[in-house]
Amino acid sequence: IMIEGDANGRGFQYPIPTYSITKNFDWSETENNKLLFEMTAKYGTPYFSNYINSDMEPSDVRSMCCRLRLDLRELRKKSGGFFGSGESTGSVGVVTINMPRIAYLSKDESEFFHRLDKLMDISARSLKIKRNVISKLLEAGLYPYTKRYLGTFNNHFSTIGLVGMNEACLNAAWIRKDLTQEEAQQFTIKVLNHMRSRLSDYQELYGDLYNLEATPAESTTYRLAKHDVKKYPGIITAAKEGQAPFYTNSSHLPVGYTDDVFSALDIQDELQTLYTSGTVFHAFLGQKLPDWKSAATLVRKIAENYKLPYYTISPTYSVCQEHGYIAGEHFTCPKCGRASEVYSRITGYYRPVQNWNDGKTSEFKQRKVYDVAHSVLHEGRMNKEEKAEVKGNCQDKPTKNLLFTRKTCPNCKTSKILLDKAGIKYVAIDAEEQKDVTLKYGVTNAPTLLVPTGSGYEVYDNVSKIKKYVEDQKN
C-alpha cells in the first residue's frame, strides 16, 4: 500500500516510520527489504536511525523513563528523531535562536557569545516558566489523558535550537565565510559546544532536562529572515538577489553547495553529532533511485561510514491528476502537458512545492540535488573498531547479582518477576536511595542487572537484556 500511494499516485504523508539500522541488520534479499527500500527509492518515506556508528543504543528509544539522573550536567540524547520519540519523553517547548542577527550585531566574537548567552538565559527561563505552568495544569486534572498515560513531564526536555548558522558565519565580521570553509566550520563547532555547556548549567540551575536541537524551522527560516531584512537592510541571508529571504536550517550547508552526497556528509557528520536531538541529514535526490538495491546500498554506506544519528533518502517526484506518479521534478506532465504537483521534503514532511512559503520556495530553487551515481565515498574515513560487550572491571566487584531499580519504573517490576520466576537470586538496590552504590558501579539506567564473573561483572542495562540473560540461564 505504501509503495502504491493513494489513488492519484501521491505518497502517503503519514505514517513516517523510523527504521533502526544496527550492526545486525539483515541486508539480504528478503521480501521485507525489497518493500522497504522500494518505498524509500520511490517516495523517500522512512527515516533511518544509525545505531552502527552513532553514540545511540537501540534501547535508548525506550529507556527515557528509566534513565537515572545522577549527573545533572549530562546532556542526554532525545532519541527517536522527529517521528519516533521514545516512551514517556518529548519537549515541553522549543525556543529557536536567530544566529545571523546575533552575528550581524556583534563587532567581534566576544560580543557574539555575550549576546548568545543573554538570549539563551531568556530562553531557558521562559521554558522553565512554561514547564511550571503546564505541570500545575496537569496536576489540577486539566490533562486527564496525559496524566493517565504519561503521569509527569519530568522526562520531557526544555529545548533550545538555532537557525542560520551558515549565514551567521557570513555576517560575522571576523569570519565572512560560509560553512563550506574550515574557519566557519570550526567556529560553528565552538558555538555548539558553548551552547551545550550552557544547557548543562541550566540543568543544574533548574533541575530539568535541557537539550540542543537542530530545529526544523519550516516557517521560522523565512519569518526571521524577512523581519531581519526589513530592520537591517545590510544583513546577509541565504537568498539570491530578487528572491524571498530565508536562512539555512540550523547548521546545514548552503543548499546549492554540492551534488556529491558524501562531500556534504563529510562536513555535516562532525556538526550534527553535537546536537542532542532533532538533527537529521536529508539526502535530496533529483528523482527515484533505479531500484531497491540502490536505495539499500546508499542507506548502508551512510550508516557504516558516518556517525550522524538520523538521515533520510529524499527523492523529488511529481504527480499528474491524469497520469499519476512521475519520477523527478515536472511542473507540467510530460505526457499530457497539464500542470502537475511537485513533491519534495520540507523539514521532514513531503509537501507540494507549490504550497511552500516564499522563503522555502527560494530554497528549493537554489537546492542542488545529490547525484548518487557520481558521488565518491572516501574509503577508510571511519576507524571501525568493534565495540566490545560492556563489562565492568571494578576492584570491588559484587559478590552477588545486583538489580538496580526505581520505585516508579514499570520495567523494574517486570525484571524482578522474570528473575523470581527463573529462581535467580539477586539483591535489589534502590538506585536513587542508595546513590553511593549506583555511582560506584557507574549505573545510569534502571533496571540494570550486574552479574559477577571471574574477571569482573556483566552489565545488563535494560529489561530486554535481562530477559535474554534469564533465557540463557534456562538453556
Protein language model regions, located:
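Conserved catalytic cores of very large enzyme subunits
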Residues: 1-154, 175, 181-335, 342
